[in-house]
Amino acid sequence: MLSLAKAKLAVVGIGRQCVAVRTLNGARAVHRSFSSSEHDQDSSTSENELFDIIISGGGMVGTAMACSLGLDPNLTGKKILLLEAGHEKKMDKIPETYSTRVSSISPGSATLLSGLGAWDHIVNMRCKPYNKMQVWDACSDALITFDKENLQDEMAYIVENDVIVAALTKQLQTLSDHVKVQYRTKVVKYTWPHPYHVSESIPWVQVALANGKTLHTKLLIGADGPNSMVRREAGIPTVKWNYDQSAVVAVLHLSEPTENNVAWQRFLPTGPIAMLPLSDTESSLVWSTSHQHAEELLQMDEESFVDAINSAFWSNENHSELVETAGSLFRMALSVLMPDSGSARQLPPSVSGIGPKSRVMFPLGMGHATEYIRHRVALIGDAAHRVHPLAGQGANLGFGDVSYLTQVLSQAAYNGKDIGAMQHLLEFETERQRHNLPMMTAIDLMKRLYSSNTAPMVLLRTFGLQATNAVPPLKEQIMAFASK
């Protein structure tokens, strides 16, 4: 349950629409007006130019890192560069159709994005809050719900990844006096400094670009995704495995308009299926299943695919009489011990269609860098950790990295210290692994627990789900941990 809870972040109220979350206090609340400019990859940097910080990777987490550093008053005057291999992500006009790649943004991440000045842009584009989550087992009647006491408060927000990147990019343009950005720039090699000064050794990280230039930096931040070149070339080992599963994602059209403020997740014998709200009439599908079944789902005609989705959420074909009887007796015992516990089951909305060309599949796996840092190197986001989407925590873990690494570097700069020194980076690694590892372990265990439909395993998780659902303080702790 720990993992599923993650998506159910506790936090700021925002009414029916996504309204601006409170800005961070202290340094992050300081706003400056800077001129916006286009970033030209040829004129932005000169040969052998030395930067204080170079960020490799301009996705959601890398761009957030650049904004966060550029806004920190203690880092004013530091030379910061963001390198991105792709084009600049702009969204001058909101697309009529929704993207299949979305993230569940926790209250903690929403607060970070607000402090960076990006949340208002997201609100002006589009996002969908939800204030309840229902998770239930396809092999029994066990369920658990997470909600806020005040249903006007949001647990989380479903936001398209493209919207997040576009909002951060727009904000980054206002920081052009503090952060340089080079798009369409490919790194071909990193050369690492010796951890101890030796004669004729290079003191900084060297970054060789495909255009022939070589840059130098006192600190390299790898935000270049699960196949991180920074991590690989730094020789940082990774513990990883594939789940023999693929996720099928799609945009769903609901049968009728609804308030659509509930996130739904059901654990099927083949993997979890989730329906996340996008609007009053559309939701996002994330269906984790076997590779073969995923291929079959992609090949189905639309009508068959829609029928398969509705059946996955509504069918009781995997129930067993033994489990139902045992679960019913356990539920009765809980109601005697805790009369006010439990939750009323809600029925998910039915699906009537899918967005055009919105069905996509991708393989699932887990990965964790054994170290987040090396001398003058730090890893953040998917470069450091990759998780199963069943908990919706991938982006939130990355934004947590951004927040804490900024804090550590800001303090080092304030104290006049070397921002690339291991002393400060170790603090970042310790704190983030302390948070990320329990979350990743819970997600992995949850995935494995629900991968079996044998009677003993189904009974174990049925009792566990019902017991957790009957103890509100425990659910509150789960939500609090997931909302960070």
From Swiss-Prot:
DNA damage keyword on record: no
Family annotation (InterPro entries): FAD-bd (IPR002938), FAD/NAD-bd_sf (IPR036188), Ubi_Hdrlase_CS (IPR018168), UbiH/COQ6 (IPR010971), UbiH/COQ6_monooxygenase (IPR051205), UbQ_mOase_COQ6 (IPR000689)
Transit pept. (range): 1-41
PROSITE patterns: UBIH
Record keywords: Cell projection, FAD, Flavoprotein, Golgi apparatus, Membrane, Mitochondrion, Mitochondrion inner membrane, Monooxygenase, Oxidoreductase, Transit peptide, Ubiquinone biosynthesis
Molecular function in Gene Ontology: 2-methoxy-6-polyprenolphenol 4-hydroxylase activity; 4-hydroxy-3-all-trans-polyprenylbenzoate oxygenase activity; FAD binding; oxidoreductase activity; oxidoreductase activity, acting on paired donors, with incorporation or reduction of molecular oxygen, reduced flavin or flavoprotein as one donor, and incorporation of one atom of oxygen
EC code: 1.14.15.45, 1.14.15.46
Record's keyword annotation contains Membrane: yes
Swiss-Prot/TrEMBL GO biological process terms: ubiquinone biosynthetic process
GO cellular component: cell projection; extrinsic component of mitochondrial inner membrane; Golgi apparatus; mitochondrion
Stated role: FAD-dependent monooxygenase required for two non-consecutive steps during ubiquinone biosynthesis. Required for the C5-ring hydroxylation during ubiquinone biosynthesis by catalyzing the hydroxylation of 4-hydroxy-3-(all-trans-polyprenyl)benzoic acid to 3,4-dihydroxy-5-(all-trans-polyprenyl)benzoic acid. Also acts downstream of coq4, for the C1-hydroxylation during ubiquinone biosynthesis by catalyzing the hydroxylation of 2-methoxy-6-(all-trans-polyprenyl)phenol to 2-methoxy-6-(all-trans-polyprenyl)benzene-1,4-diol.
PANTHER family reported in the protein's UniProt record: UBIQUINONE BIOSYNTHESIS MONOOXYGENASE COQ6, MITOCHONDRIAL
NCBIfam families: COQ6, Ubi-OHases
Protein's name in the database: Ubiquinone biosynthesis monooxygenase COQ6, mitochondrial
Source organism of this protein record: Danio rerio
